[in-house]
Amino acid sequence: MNETPLLHCSRLSKRYQEGKLYTYVLRNVSFMLERGEMMAIVGSSGSGKSTLLHLLGGLDEPTGGEVIFEGQQLNKLSSAARAMVRNRRLGFIYQFHHLLPDFTALENVAMPLLIGGARPAQAQETAREMLAAVGLEKRGHHRPAELSGGERQRVAIARALVNHPALVLADEPTGNLDQRNADSIFELLGELNMRQGTAFLVVTHDLQLAKRLHRQLEMRDGALLGAAQ
């Protein structure tokens, strides 16, 4: 018997209404992501990539279709249940790191654990281990303003992975970095995938970086067109 996919989205659509006018952002998007798989969705700005990630992460609800993650239909869960899934089983990385400026790197990484009810001492220890995993074991006491752009994004990655999620959703995670740091971040994601078995779904406009992942799909005008070329 085949193992159930980690993520299955079926005929996913999203539209917005202004008066009598409907604007479709996503149209009948369907695909599956296996456990431990790294997949890229490639497309230009405005193609619907970020909207898709919001639906997959339970941050928004689709107009039509369904998102099934670890056997649960996310868009049928209550807001509280979706929030619990996001905290415990999903990680998020964005183009801008969204670190809390008044907290150290260590405190930023520990935050999801504390929100989930972990004891402070255990949260700090786990966060320290995660910072070491991304090569920042000596930078934990620094605040975001004292870190380079690449270091801030590594802290954001550590925060996304600190709860050992099954899946990390990454929205243009290297879009704000120079080429050297972008290469380094994609290399790090690959290492974490191999070491921890975490699945990654990365949206990006950079096909060359996307080709480092296991699979690439192209999105255009809100529709998936198949393998990116």
Swiss-Prot record:
Acyltransferase in keyword set: no
Q: Which GO terms are recorded in the biological process aspect for this UniProt protein?
A: lipoprotein localization to outer membrane; protein localization to outer membrane
Q: How does it assemble?
A: The complex is composed of two ATP-binding proteins (LolD) and two transmembrane proteins (LolC and LolE).
The UniProt record lists the keyword Cell membrane = yes
- Which compartments is it annotated to reside in? Cell inner membrane
Keyword terms of this UniProt record: ATP-binding, Cell inner membrane, Cell membrane, Membrane, Nucleotide-binding, Translocase, Transport
Pfam families (alphabetical): ABC_tran
Q: What's the gene?
A: lolD
- Annotated InterPro entries: AAA+_ATPase, ABC_transporter-like_ATP-bd, ABC_transporter-like_CS, ABC_transpr_LolD-like, LolD_lipo_ATP-bd, MacB-like_ATP-bd, P-loop_NTPase
| Taxonomic source organism | Sodalis glossinidius (strain morsitans)
Its annotated function is as follows: Part of the ABC transporter complex LolCDE involved in the translocation of mature outer membrane-directed lipoproteins, from the inner membrane to the periplasmic chaperone, LolA. Responsible for the formation of the LolA-lipoprotein complex in an ATP-dependent manner.
Major localisation: membrane
Q: Which residues pair up as cystines?
A: none
Q: What is this protein called?
A: Lipoprotein-releasing system ATP-binding protein LolD
Top-level taxon: Bacteria
